[in-house]
């Protein structure tokens, strides 16, 4: 991973903004006024909408006083306000990217000036069957906008010849109500929509093996379409490097055997299987190769901001456009720090990613990049969908008494169970730091059974963790969870 040109100074009383994304002088003045008003409101005991801290694009640090600062955490759909010791806290967020002024126009421009291939209009004709993959309910993809733009570029293709594939991977099928929220009645009423099922062997076709031996079983109907298109959104991924692009083929539309091999203990445990790394990442290398084997004809990816608004669109050859999108997302999300922190407070980016504890491991993984060994990670994730109840995650956790025992089991020869990859990453994190979890959707006993420490009050928990760490203890907050990927500058890869 090449070093990013984001010079940061993490001194206690200094602040430097990213040169590339420096705010205009007027916006700086507005931000300063808002911050001063916020402090005045705190001093007077007043809480108003304006009392929330200014969301700086890079870092907000304490000013050396004993006052507390209010930080808004992404939690469920409503968020969670937490008051933290101002002199201790460093808040790190992605570079502030405004929404594009016209999402439809931005998508159309990308589709008509694609990267690495000819425009979609020139690649499709009447009578062809079209397959389009989209993310499942756990992802905040703007599906309707992307599909609408694609439909405009396929004027001669009737909706009855288009099938939308929900790229669930090994996740559960999405319900009718969820599909309506995701796609809308118009698309549901005019296009065929299919939930992919990785366990339904009759719906799969064997394509071959990758150069590393991964058996490639993919959705048969997707493969048999005349035109295969993927849509997604790109953000850092905790072991695949980045989401979107080729991941919308595998694991998105892959069979269970393929997913299990892509996510085996050796690949997940590889040092390059991490946030923001693609080249040399064994997971991403295989995923790219699978997409090439399939022959995807066109791909559309977007990047999003905190409000789940489109900030950029990319289209064209699945690998070339994805590489461009990854570069853009990396500049937004990857933030360098000089030293690890005693305590890191994180989230799982709010709804829909924080629907369950399984997904919350991603937020913990982001925090683990910069927490001191023996430190504490505090994770606030709503988990309205529980563990969840489907899948093997809960059963694996219940099968062993400690994270150490879980890792030993997963790394033992011949062990292979769906969802083991999430438990593997979770256990690796827990060997480095204590993990304390705030959730509204799980009981304290359920959190404890998952080998975490349950908490009710985030601020009190942070205070206690800082006290245990001793004088001069440091605190970092990732309000947007894995939308921000901090890393130690010394750990940069080329």
Summary of predicted features, one role per range:
Residues 4-10, 17-20, 36-39, 43-44, ...:
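Alpha-helix boundary/capping motif
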Residues 354-436:
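C-terminal catalytic subdomain
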Residues 174-242:
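An acidic, phosphate/nucleotide-engaging active-site surface
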Residues 160-170, 378-381, 434-439:
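Short internal beta-strands
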Residues 140-158, 360-370:
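Histidine-anchored nucleotide/phosphate-binding helix
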């Amino acid at each position: 991973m090449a070093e990013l040109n984001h010079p940061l100074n993490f001194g206690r009383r200094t602040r430097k903004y990213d040169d590339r994304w420096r705010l205009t002088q007027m916006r700086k003045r507005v931000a300063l006024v808002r911050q001063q008003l916020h402090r005045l409101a705190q001093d007077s005991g007043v809480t108003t909408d304006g009392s929330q801290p200014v969301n700086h694009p890079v870092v907000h640090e304490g000013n050396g006083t004993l006052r507390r600062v209010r930080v808004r955490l992404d939690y469920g759909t409503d968020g969670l306000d937490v008051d933290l010791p101002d002199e201790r806290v460093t808040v790190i967020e992605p570079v502030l990217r405004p929404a594009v002024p016209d999402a439809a126009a931005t998508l159309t421009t990308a589709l008509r000036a694609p990267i690495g291939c000819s425009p979609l209009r020139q690649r499709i004709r009447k009578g062809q069957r079209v397959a389009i993959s989209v993310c499942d309910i756990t992802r905040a993809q703007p599906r309707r906008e992307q599909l609408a733009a694609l439909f405009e570029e396929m004027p001669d293709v009737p909706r009855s010849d288009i099938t939308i594939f929900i790229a669930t991977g090994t996740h559960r099928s999405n319900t009718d109500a969820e599909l309506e929220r995701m796609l809308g009645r118009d698309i549901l009423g005019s296009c065929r929509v299919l939930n992919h099922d990785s366990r339904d062997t009759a719906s799969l076709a064997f394509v071959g093996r990758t150069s590393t031996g991964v058996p490639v079983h993919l959705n048969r109907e997707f493969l048999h379409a005349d035109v295969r298109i993927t849509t997604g959104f790109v953000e850092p991924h905790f072991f695949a490097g980045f989401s979107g692009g080729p991941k919308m083929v595998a694991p998105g539309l892959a069979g269970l055997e393929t997913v299990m091999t892509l996510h085996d203990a050796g690949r997940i445990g590889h040092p390059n299987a991490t946030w923001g790394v693609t080249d040399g990442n064994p997971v991403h290398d295989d995923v790219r190769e699978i997409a090439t084997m399939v022959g995807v004809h066109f791909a559309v990816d977007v990047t999003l901001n905190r409000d789940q608004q489109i900030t950029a669109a990319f289209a064209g050859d699945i690998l070339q456009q994805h590489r461009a999108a990854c570069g853009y997302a990396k500049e937004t999300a990857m933030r360098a720090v000089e030293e690890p922190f005693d305590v890191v407070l994180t989230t799982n980016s709010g709804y829909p990613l924080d629907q369950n504890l399984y997904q919350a491991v991603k937020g913990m993984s982001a925090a683990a990049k910069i927490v001191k060994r023996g430190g504490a990670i505090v994770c606030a994730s709503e988990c309205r969908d529980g563990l969840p109840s489907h899948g093997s995650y809960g059963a694996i956790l219940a099968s062993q008494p400690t994270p150490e025992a879980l890792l030993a089991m997963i790394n033992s020869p011949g062990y292979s169970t769906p969802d083991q990859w999430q438990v593997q990453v979770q256990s690796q994190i827990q060997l480095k730091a204590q993990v304390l979890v705030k959730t509204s959707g799980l009981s304290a006993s359920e959190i404890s059974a998952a080998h975490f420490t349950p908490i009710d009050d985030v601020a009190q928990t942070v205070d206690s963790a800082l006290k245990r760490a001793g004088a001069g203890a440091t605190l970092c907050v990732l309000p947007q969870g894995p939308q921000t990927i901090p890393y130690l500058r010394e750990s940069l890869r080329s």
